[in-house]
């Protein structure tokens, strides 16, 4: 399944200037929650579930009208109590009451439980970009930092999942603590830290 992420700065190849860790995590397939679980104990905190309009760079990706109502789910994924990822997912409102209705009942379970356990779900290519102030994802990520100083930009990725032709798009913004962990410990848990996962 193809996803035209070339609009609004989203692209399949990470931009020059990304570190090796950033290139890896922006293009790594499979469940992001499962990858985070290798670093420590993952917790999912739901910060918002609501009906809303899509962001300016989302309608084309899910083939919807700019003001079409969406079911929106936003969460913070923390590892050992520290926020590592802010995630924003949307599905057309009708689909959220139909083929994607289970996303409304997840509570604090990760969306990955729906996306990677169903053989009828297809995933597009991952696309990524840097987000800066002015993009709604930047505000979401900054809020996830809980008052800590935000960097000039965040690295983010997104992809579209389809089930019976109905889209669900997941956008994931990596927070500074993830890169600090990888710099210090590589792709494994902190020395002596708790393991586990979601």
Swiss-Prot record:
Naming one, the record's GO cellular component terms include: cytosol
Q: Which residues bind substrate?
A: 73, 111, 172
GN (gene name): ubiC
The molecular function terms in GO held by this entry are: chorismate lyase activity
Q: Name one GO biological process term.
A: ubiquinone biosynthetic process
Describe the task this protein carries out. Removes the pyruvyl group from chorismate, with concomitant aromatization of the ring, to provide 4-hydroxybenzoate (4HB) for the ubiquinone pathway.
The family classification in the record reads: Belongs to the UbiC family.
Pathway the protein takes part in = Cofactor biosynthesis; ubiquinone biosynthesis
Q: Name one Pfam family in it.
A: Chor_lyase
- Its primary localisation, in coarse terms, equals cytoplasm
**Which EC numbers characterise this protein's activity in its record?**
4.1.3.40
The record ties this protein, via SUPFAM superfamilies, to: Chorismate lyase-like (SSF64288)
Q: Where in the cell is it found?
A: Cytoplasm
This protein's UniProt keywords? Cytoplasm, Lyase, Pyruvate, Ubiquinone biosynthesis
Does the record's keyword annotation contain Cytoplasm?
yes
Q: Which reaction does it catalyse?
A: chorismate = 4-hydroxybenzoate + pyruvate
Protein name (database record): Probable chorismate pyruvate-lyase
């Amino acid at each position: 399944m193809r996803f035209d992420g070339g609009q609004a700065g989203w692209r399949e190849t990470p931009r020059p200037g990304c570190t090796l860790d950033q290139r890896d995590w922006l293009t790594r397939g499979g469940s992001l929650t499962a990858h985070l679980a290798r670093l420590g104990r993952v917790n999912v905190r739901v910060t918002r579930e609501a009906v809303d309009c899509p962001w300016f760079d989302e309608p084309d990706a899910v083939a919807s009208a700019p003001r079409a109502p969406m079911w929106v789910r936003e969460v913070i994924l923390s590892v050992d109590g520290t926020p590592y990822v802010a995630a924003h997912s949307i599905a057309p409102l009708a689909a959220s009451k139909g083929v994607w209705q289970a996303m409304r009942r997840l509570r604090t379970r990760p969306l990955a439980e729906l996306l990677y356990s169903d053989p009828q779900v297809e995933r597009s290519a991952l696309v990524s970009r840097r987000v800066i102030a002015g993009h709604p994802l930047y505000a979401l990520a900054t809020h996830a930092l809980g008052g800590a100083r935000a960097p000039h930009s965040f690295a983010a990725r997104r992809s579209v999942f389809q089930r019976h032709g109905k889209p669900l798009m997941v956008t994931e913004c990596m927070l500074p603590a993830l890169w600090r962990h990888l710099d210090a410990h590589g792709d494994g848990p902190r020395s002596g830290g708790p393991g586990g996962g979601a």
